[in-house]
């Protein structure tokens, strides 16, 4: 057999985000040829904040130690042993809102063991580990052809160019173009849908936060819960500024298409929290007059029936876009990346003549292994958003019930056997080869 006969698998990754670049590193680490096709013209400047659990970090190290090393360079470990969840609605004075009786429940941070980072910082650090030429910018996928008669999958881009690869991993996010091709544009799950939650963010001077909440609350991460809304807040910039995220339930449809950010106003936010305690109203009064309203989309209403078809698969948000209320959506994508890398490693080591069949078997195995856990996360995150806003009937406003439900669901995320997941996936793939 010639060297050419044993050429490594050629993998195309659609999307140069966190999961796409992480997957690329994991595959390169295993000797694959990898090309990442990113629709943007360059890397993003900053981006949102992400947090990764201990389970996700275990997956990163197994995927490629360089991934975890990148995270360690840019991440901040949670400095808080616990997060307190306060009543944002019933206290009628700022003083009452600071009393112990206003604490609904508190959660220890040791199990989730979050490391938080800015998306752009992590992405750029990982990207610096990639060889030159791996990433091609300005490549927006519009179609692909996975005809069995063709030796490779043909990718078609908006600029008129094409490319070929043995296997395609789509990490192109919540509005995945690949998902639309894989499922069909008319499939209910082809597009993510509005979760009926929106979010507003503001940076408040620390002095104003102390005035509204008190010194103790303003210097730690906390959450305030209440009817149809909740507020998550924490200090940043070495305690000089207070970062506030206010989430609202929205009974209406989102009438801005797939535009997820629209202009809004402080008065609109204030109208939504009428009846809340004076401490929350005071914090909102510190928002700038013009704010952005962020729509939260997910796949909870229309979960995908499968994540793979032929030699093409979806990973991360392209497969299971989640709301942020578990803080674990990106962690699911890390688990996806590890399973894919391990299964494709088996394909690459197998007979070249059977590669096309084996790629399909590996991707079907990946889909079957990952779909239950990742889709549980999507639905559970929806439920957690309702729990925080007293819209989840089993818990209502009861702090003890909220805590028990929070801990039960969180345990599914952090108490997870990564080695068992990988071993189970490999065993399932090997059984499919025997069929």
From Swiss-Prot:
Organism: Aspergillus terreus (strain NIH 2624 / FGSC A1156)
Enzyme Commission number(s) of this protein: 1.-.-.-
Membrane protein topology class: Single-pass membrane protein
Official protein name in the record: FAD-dependent monooxygenase ATEG_07662
Transmembrane segments: 8-28
Enzyme class, first EC level, given as a word: oxidoreductase
Main localization of the protein described in the UniProt heading: membrane
A Pfam family assignment: FAD_binding_3
Gene ablation phenotype (knockout): Abolishes the production of azasperpyranone A.
Pathway(s) the chain acts in: Secondary metabolite biosynthesis
Cellular component, GO annotation: membrane
GO process terms (BP): secondary metabolite biosynthetic process
Induction, as annotated: Expression is induced by the azasperpyranone cluster A-specific transcription factor ATEG_07666 which is itself regulated by the azasperpyranone transcriptional regulator ATEG_07667.
UniProt key word Flavoprotein: yes
């Amino acid at each position: 057999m010639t060297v050419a006969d044993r050429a490594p698998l050629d993998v195309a990754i659609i999307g140069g985000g966190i999961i796409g670049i992480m997957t690329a590193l994991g595959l390169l680490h295993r000797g694959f040829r990898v090309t990442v096709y990113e629709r943007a013209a360059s890397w993003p400047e900053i981006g949102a904040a992400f947090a990764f659990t201990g389970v996700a970090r275990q997956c990163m190290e197994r995927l490629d130690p360089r991934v975890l090393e990148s995270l360690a360079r840019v991440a901040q470990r949670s400095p808080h042993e616990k997060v307190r969840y306060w009543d944002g609605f019933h206290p009628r004075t700022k003083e009452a809102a600071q009393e112990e009786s206003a604490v609904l429940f508190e959660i220890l941070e040791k199990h989730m063991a979050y490391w938080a980072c800015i998306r752009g910082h992590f992405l750029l650090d990982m990207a610096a580990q990639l060889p030159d030429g791996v990433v091609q910018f300005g490549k927006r996928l519009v179609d692909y052809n996975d005809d069995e008669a063709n030796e490779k999958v043909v990718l078609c881009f908006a600029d008129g160019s094409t490319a070929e690869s043995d296997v395609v991993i789509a990490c192109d996010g919540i509005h995945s173009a690949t998902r639309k091709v894989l499922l069909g544009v008319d499939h209910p799950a082809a597009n993510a849908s509005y979760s009926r939650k929106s979010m507003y963010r503001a940076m408040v001077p620390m002095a104003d936060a102390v005035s509204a909440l008190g010194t103790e609350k303003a210097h730690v991460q906390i959450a305030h819960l209440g009817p149809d809304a909740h507020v998550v807040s924490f200090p940043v910039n070495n305690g000089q500024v207070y970062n506030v995220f206010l989430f609202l339930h929205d009974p209406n449809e989102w009438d801005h298409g797939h535009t997820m950010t629209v202009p809004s106003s402080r008065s609109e936010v204030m109208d939504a929290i009428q009846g809340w305690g004076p401490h929350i109203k005071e914090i909102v009064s510190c928002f700038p007059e013009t704010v952005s309203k962020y729509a939260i989309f997910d796949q909870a209403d229309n979960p995908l029936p499968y994540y793979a078809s032929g030699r093409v698969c979806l990973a991360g948000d392209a497969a299971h876009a989640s709301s942020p209320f578990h803080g674990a959506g990106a962690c699911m994508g890390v688990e996806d990346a590890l399973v894919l890398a391990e299964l494709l490693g088996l394909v690459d080591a197998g007979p070249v003549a059977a590669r096309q069949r084996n790629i399909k078997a590996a991707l079907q195995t990946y889909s079957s292994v990952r779909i239950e856990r990742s889709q549980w996360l999507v639905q559970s995150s929806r439920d957690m958003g309702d729990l925080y806003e007293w819209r989840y009937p089993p818990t209502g406003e009861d702090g003890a019930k909220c805590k028990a439900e929070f801990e039960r669901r969180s345990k599914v995320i952090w108490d997870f056997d990564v080695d068992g997941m990988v071993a189970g996936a490999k065993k399932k793939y090997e059984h499919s080869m025997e069929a």
